[in-house]
Swiss-Prot record:
Keywords: Methyltransferase, S-adenosyl-L-methionine, Transferase, tRNA processing. Catalyzes the formation of N(7)-methylguanine at position 46 (m7G46) in tRNA. This is tRNA (guanine-N(7)-)-methyltransferase. One of its GO terms (molecular function) is tRNA (guanine(46)-N7)-methyltransferase activity. SUPFAM superfamilies: S-adenosyl-L-methionine-dependent methyltransferases. It catalyses: guanosine(46) in tRNA + S-adenosyl-L-methionine = N(7)-methylguanosine(46) in tRNA + S-adenosyl-L-homocysteine. S-adenosyl-L-methionine binds at E46, E71, N100, D122. InterPro entries: SAM-dependent_MTases_sf, tRNA_(Gua-N-7)_MeTrfase_Trmb, tRNA_methyltr_TrmB_bact. It comes from Leuconostoc mesenteroides subsp. mesenteroides (strain ATCC 8293 / DSM 20343 / BCRC 11652 / CCM 1803 / JCM 6124 / NCDO 523 / NBRC 100496 / NCIMB 8023 / NCTC 12954 / NRRL B-1118 / 37Y). Substrate binds at K126, D158, T199, E200, Y201, E202. One of its GO terms (cellular component) is tRNA methyltransferase complex.
């Protein structure tokens, strides 16, 4: 969903370039992302961070991991980063990329990212837009290019069609998972919901009684 523009967004992002990296700088940062964090530790990347509730929650819950939230919408990335900054200042283990998730391999070297998260991605329901889905084969190739061998992609959605499409896409690409790695109703599963950090969309869909689908797939 496209957010209404915020007049303050552009200036705020420019003033906080230490925590929000634009696309050009992100490309130049390849192989050197650890230098932006206080400590060298595994980097987890969320593609399509929206307003940032998930990535902030994860960074607060797991200080032993460095997190990067990537978002293409200026308003969304500004809201996410400012919310984080206003609540807790500059977190030592959280940075953002204001950029496109298409071509993520131009930002990171092989193995530089330890895990990729996709949360409530745009389903792009029309067949002619299939290649825009973040679980389409060209995106999977990009994720594989930055993850270590057998790297993991974690995907959550409320959209049953997109979930089924994604499972087929993962399988066709050669990715694997076990029965313990997926659920058709996350919040009805006491074991799998442990440690779950909710997104803004997730909370909205839960309030409507819609099931949340989740899978962890490995290359």
């Amino acid at each position: 969903m496209h957010l209404r523009s915020k007049p303050w967004a552009s200036d705020w992002l420019a003033e906080h370039s230490d925590i929000v990296i634009d696309q050009d700088r992100a490309t130049a940062q390849i192989g050197q992302w650890q230098s932006l964090f206080d400590q060298e530790q595994p980097i987890h990347l969320e593609i399509g961070s929206g307003k940032g509730q998930f990535i902030l929650g994860m960074a607060l819950a797991h200080p032993e991991i460095n997190y990067i939230g990537m978002e293409i919408q200026e308003t969304a990335i500004a809201i996410a980063a400012r919310k984080s900054f206003d609540q807790v200042g500059t977190l030592p283990n959280l940075r953002y990329i204001y950029g496109n998730g298409n071509g993520v391999e131009t930002y990171f070297e092989k193995g530089e990212v330890s895990k990729v998260y996709l949360n409530f991605s745009d389903p792009w329901p029309k067949k002619r837009h299939e290649s825009r889905r973040l679980t389409y084969k060209s995106f999977l190739k990009s994720y594989e290019a930055v993850l270590p061998e057998h790297g993991e992609v974690e995907f959550k959605t409320d959209n049953r069609h997109l979930f089924e499409y994604s499972m087929v896409s993962f399988m066709d690409y050669g990715m694997r998972w076990t029965p313990e790695d997926y659920t058709l109703d996350l919040h009805a599963d006491e074991d799998k919901v442990q440690g779950n950090v909710e997104t803004e969309y997730e909370q909205k869909f839960m309030a409507k009684g819609q099931p949340i689908y989740k899978i962890k797939a490995h290359f």
